[in-house]
């Protein structure tokens, strides 16, 4: 083991050991441990002792500090702490530097809220300098509270040397990345249709619409089917003069900027006359849409409408036909108001004819650009109509919808109006409904490197594994160029200066402070607006000297900052060159699944473009934390418990275990509730604590001054050999799962092991501990507990620390080495056999429960039938004691028919969606059992996730074994057995009374037992020796009291 330092006043003796109690007070324990870590500087010591180990790189995704953490943050934080702890115990050097995300809309919106302003124009009025100063202050509002939360959840991070994206060094590295990519041709300026937030008056990136399920919300909009009369020579030639094309839209506000209609080239379109009275109109629409429009065209059915088709044409035949525009605003535009064709047209909805507004539709613009149709933007940055649209000038587009509908209806241009409920994108920050708008923006060219990004993706280990070729690969395959500019104020500036005179064009891009200072002659201490905007200089390419180089006003998307984190946190390439280039790819990264399309994606894009390599080697994508109402945990909904209140009542380690051991680490969702957290405590923390408490009490009682146990794997007792070998297998399994970043499976191994430790090893060894002379039992349990503390340090760091320090008197479990499987005996045959014995016993106890026979009631015999007896015979005494039977017989024989019963509540958290697969497989008999390893539908099951039940029992007193065979109990109870059962019930009653009086386990007692009649008295007298031995009774009086109900006991500490 590594050197932990002297056990002196600097460590354990300063630690406030609490008097052991049967149940842990987790908040109090955690308070003690945190205080010790702080004074002892244990985190710093853990780094110092590993500083010569291999550097293991972990990227800690920076949070925004303008709000307090919720359970989603906690989960990510727990994983960010657990994996580095594990790697540190494995000998790696794992620096953990905390960072803060400080730029972008979140900061600006918070500043606007504090300043009491709501519009972008108000920012311009007050001045960018004042606004950005408010933004700077707002982003650090909750830093101290975040540190408090992070420390309280036992996360070990370095705050002192942390970074902020607003730091000058960080921003300089971002400028370097921009210029490098610009020189490579990866960054370019373009004019495209993008998601646009009219409230924040800035474009967004397509990936920002896919990161969060809450971006898309149900919205009710007007759905209009509008008529477009066909005109011109080609319409006459095709016999369509006077026919009106029907186009469907859910955005009436885009109709004033309609420039074209688009059809699908190889789809059939039909001309149908209106069947309405006093109407002689003819309409053109997609043939497949006719059924849905039959009624509004005046037909009783789609069949009637189809029977009235006058003409059928392919879309490509009507391409080039002109139509009468809805409005006259752009009537004179060349190439406008023509039918175009393209395969993107969806004919399953609407009329199969798309109203194209190239200023507000990505595909609309692509098609219109190809045909030379102009793009006109008729709204301003705030989504209000410009003066060109005179009827609606100054009106917000959403307010204009109803007015436009009314005007078109008045003009007879609407065939059908309905309300349409659909999923609609909203801004991920301000939650306003987004629009699509043609804007000039700077782009990160991703489409050219998609294939390389897909190739590099194969080098990444994803958890869950399905992400690699599933969500992430699919997202990469359809990736679009990333809009990286924002028409905002608080962010890293785009480092591009342009000539203000197009007659003398020039563009300069800067990638360092030195380049800026050399050209502008000013020492820079801040790269934010407006300071950076003041940098101007004469255009070197203008011989007249009249034009000036001015910076483009936009700032970078905050996600560009985030994607630069791997190198910008180190101020690369200006510092730490060797350090970064030796570890360009992080060993580990973790965030929630939404970041597959966010930070993970952009890190991958940035690393591919800059370094032609992966940004990270291993990634965990955990699922979404839900509130107690099943919705995503939300501060506004207040649908989850107060985080700090849970810390102060249940404890952080309880929350940590609950989250880390759940299916959320496999990408599923998880509902957080206090009850579930409390239930989780009983899975691992309580059994661990109970085992240590048992060890402490019994080792203290073993001899005067107590027995000082030692780490030993030498015992030859069969139960000791079993639990030591089982511990070695536990180390092997937990290590394997941790190495593959499967923390949930590792946690389940620990949970299952402590159940075996408490319910089997300790219970079956209780007499040896009580005797006190068998030091092998104490050494074995000490060894197991010491190992459990080291394994559990990753999962419950504070409880493990407390138990470890009290157990070993060492400085800290977190300064110890990870257990070595080679330390432990490797008796797999013994383990397999003993596990069979355990299953025999659990089956027998389950049979008792089914038959209504208490475990304390002795029975005469148990008969065990198995396909192969093997070495089971030598375990008869253990089976007899566990099943409370006088004799055990074991024979080889045929097995009863068995059925597999899945336990969904147990299997569900691990298997998630696969649980239904295994249930169905079990029902149809598609399952196998090989040496106790059960597989259903090809999916392996854990021991506690199923039951094997008899399909046809030998008798009601038999129960099938999970590995084949059966247990049969002789349920005949004679008077002697019944008397012993009464005596054992009485012993149990006395033990409860001892606990209630808070007696030490070594305290002797005087006992008075009152019974209702002589028969019961005689029964107890027959087993008085048993009663006295089991309860440490030195004086026993059994009295008959007529009329009492049952047996009562009273006791006192014995005094000679």
From Swiss-Prot:
Its cofactor is Zn(2+). Pfam families: Anticodon_1, DUF5915, tRNA-synt_1. Its main location: cytoplasm. ATP binds at residue 635. This is Isoleucine--tRNA ligase. It comes from Tropheryma whipplei (strain Twist). InterPro entries: aa-tRNA-synth_Ia (IPR002300), Anticodon_Ile_ABEc (IPR033709), Ile-tRNA-ligase (IPR002301), Ile-tRNA-ligase_type2 (IPR023586), M/V/L/I-tRNA-synth_anticd-bd (IPR013155), Rossmann-like_a/b/a_fold (IPR014729), tRNAsynth_Ia_anticodon-bd (IPR009080), Val/Leu/Ile-tRNA-synth_edit (IPR009008). The keyword Nucleotide-binding applies.
């Amino acid at each position: 083991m590594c050197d932990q330092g002297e056990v002196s006043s600097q460590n354990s003796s300063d630690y406030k050991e609490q008097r052991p109690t049967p149940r842990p007070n987790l908040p109090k324990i955690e308070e003690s441990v945190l205080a010790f870590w702080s004074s002892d500087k244990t985190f710093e010591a853990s780094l110092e002792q590993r500083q010569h180990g291999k550097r293991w790189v972990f990227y800690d995704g920076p949070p925004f500090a303008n709000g307090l953490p919720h359970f989603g943050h906690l989960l990510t934080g727990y994983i960010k702490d657990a994996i580095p702890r594990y790697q540190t115990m494995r000998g790696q050097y794992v620096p953990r530097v905390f960072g803060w995300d400080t730029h972008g809309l979140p900061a600006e919106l918070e500043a606007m809220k504090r300043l009491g302003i709501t519009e972008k124009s108000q920012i311009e009025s007050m001045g960018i300098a004042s606004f950005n100063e408010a933004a700077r202050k707002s982003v650090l509002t909750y830093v101290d509270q975040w540190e408090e939360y992070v420390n309280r959840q036992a996360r070990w991070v370095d705050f002192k040397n942390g970074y902020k994206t607003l730091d000058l060094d960080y921003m300089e590295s971002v400028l370097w990345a921009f210029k490098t990519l610009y020189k490579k041709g990866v960054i370019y300026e373009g004019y495209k249709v993008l998601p646009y937030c009219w409230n924040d008056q800035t474009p967004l990136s397509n990936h920002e619409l896919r990161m969060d399920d809450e971006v898309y919300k149900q919205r009710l909009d007007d759905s209009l089917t509008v008529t477009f009369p066909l005109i011109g020579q080609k319409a006459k030639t095709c016999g369509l003069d006077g026919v009106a094309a029907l186009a469907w839209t859910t955005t009436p506000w885009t109709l004033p900027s309609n420039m074209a209609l688009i059809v699908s080239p190889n789809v059939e379109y039909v001309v149908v006359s209106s069947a309405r009275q006093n109407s002689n109109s003819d309409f053109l629409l997609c043939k497949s849409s006719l059924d849905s429009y039959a009624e509004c065209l005046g037909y009783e059915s789609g069949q009637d409408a189809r029977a009235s088709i006058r003409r059928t044409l392919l879309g490509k035949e009507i391409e080039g036909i002109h139509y009468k525009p809805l409005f006259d605003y752009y009537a004179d535009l060349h190439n406008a108001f023509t039918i175009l064709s393209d395969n993107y047209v969806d004919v399953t909805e609407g009329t199969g004819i798309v109203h194209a507004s190239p200023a507000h539709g990505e595909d609309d613009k692509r098609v219109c650009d190809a045909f030379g149709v102009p793009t006109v933007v008729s709204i301003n940055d705030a989504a209000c109509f410009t003066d060109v649209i005179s009827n609606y000038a100054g009106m917000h587009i959403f307010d204009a919808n109803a007015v436009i509908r009314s005007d078109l209806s008045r003009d007879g241009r609407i065939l059908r109006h309905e309300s349409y409920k659909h999923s609609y994108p909203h801004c991920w920050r301000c939650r306003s409904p987004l629009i699509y708008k043609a804007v000039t923006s700077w782009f990160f060219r991703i489409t050219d490197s998609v294939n390389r990004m897909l190739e590099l993706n194969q080098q990444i280990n994803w958890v869950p594994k399905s992400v690699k070729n599933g969500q992430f690969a699919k997202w990469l395959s359809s990736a679009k160029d990333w809009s990286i500019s924002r028409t905002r104020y608080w962010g890293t500036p785009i480092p591009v200066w342009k000539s203000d005179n197009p007659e003398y064009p020039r563009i300069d891009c800067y990638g360092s402070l030195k380049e800026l200072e050399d050209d502008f002659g000013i020492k820079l201490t801040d790269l934010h607006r407006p300071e950076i905007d003041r940098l101007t200089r004469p255009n070197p390419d203008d011989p007249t000297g009249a034009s000036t180089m001015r910076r483009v006003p936009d700032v970078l998307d905050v996600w560009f900052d985030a994607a630069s984190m791997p190198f910008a946190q180190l101020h690369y390439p200006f510092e730490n060159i060797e350090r970064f280039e030796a570890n360009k790819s992080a060993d580990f990264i973790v965030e929630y699944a939404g970041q597959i399309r966010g930070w993970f994606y952009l890190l991958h894009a940035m690393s591919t473009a800059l370094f032609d390599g992966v940004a990270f080697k291993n990634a965990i994508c955990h699922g979404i934390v839900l509130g107690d109402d099943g919705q995503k945990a939300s501060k506004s909904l207040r649908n989850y418990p107060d985080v700090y209140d849970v810390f102060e009542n249940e404890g952080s380690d309880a929350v940590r275990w609950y989250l880390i051991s759940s299916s959320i680490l496999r990408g599923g969702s998880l509902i957080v509730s206090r009850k579930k957290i409390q239930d989780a405590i009983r899975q691992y923390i309580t059994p661990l604590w109970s085992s240590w408490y048992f060890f402490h009490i019994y080792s203290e009682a073993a001899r005067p001054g107590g027995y000082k146990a030692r780490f030993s794997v030498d015992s030859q007792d069969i139960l000791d050999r079993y639990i030591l070998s089982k511990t070695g297998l536990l180390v092997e399994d937990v290590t394997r799962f941790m190495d593959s970043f499967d923390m949930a499976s590792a946690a389940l191994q620990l949970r299952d092991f402590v159940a075996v430790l408490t319910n089997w090893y300790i219970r079956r060894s209780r007499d040896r501990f009580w005797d006190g002379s068998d030091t092998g039992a104490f050494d074995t349990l000490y060894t197991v507990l010491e190992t459990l503390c080291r394994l559990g340090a990753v999962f419950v760091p504070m409880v493990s620390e407390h138990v470890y320090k009290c157990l070993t008197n060492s400085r800290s479990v977190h300064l110890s080495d990870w257990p070595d499987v080679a330390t432990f005996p490797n008796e797999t045959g013994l383990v397999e056999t003993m596990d069979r014995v355990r299953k025999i016993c659990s089956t027998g106890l389950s049979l008792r429960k089914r038959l209504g026979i208490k475990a304390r009631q002795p029975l005469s015999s148990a008969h065990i039938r198995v396909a192969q007896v093997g070495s089971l015979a030598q375990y008869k005494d253990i089976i007899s004691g566990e099943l409370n039977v006088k004799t055990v017989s074991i024979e080889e024989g045929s097995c009863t028919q068995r059925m597999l019963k899945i336990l969904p509540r147990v299997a569900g958290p691990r298997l998630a969606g696969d649980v239904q697969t295994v249930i169905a497989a079990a029902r149809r008999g598609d399952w196998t059992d090989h040496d106790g390893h059960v597989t259903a539908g090809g999916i392996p099951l854990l021991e506690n996730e199923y039951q094997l039940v008899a399909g046809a029992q030998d008798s009601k007193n038999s129960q099938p074994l999970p590995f084949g065979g059966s247990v049969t109990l002789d349920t005949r109870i004679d008077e002697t057995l019944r008397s012993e059962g009464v005596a054992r019930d009485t012993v149990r009653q006395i033990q409860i009374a001892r606990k209630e009086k808070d007696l030490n386990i070594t305290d002797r007692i005087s006992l008075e037992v009152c019974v209702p009649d002589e028969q019961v008295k005689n029964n107890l007298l027959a087993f008085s020796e048993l009663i006295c031995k089991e309860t440490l009774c030195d004086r026993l009086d059994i009295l008959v009291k007529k009329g009492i109900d049952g047996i009562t006991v009273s006791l006192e500490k014995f005094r000679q």
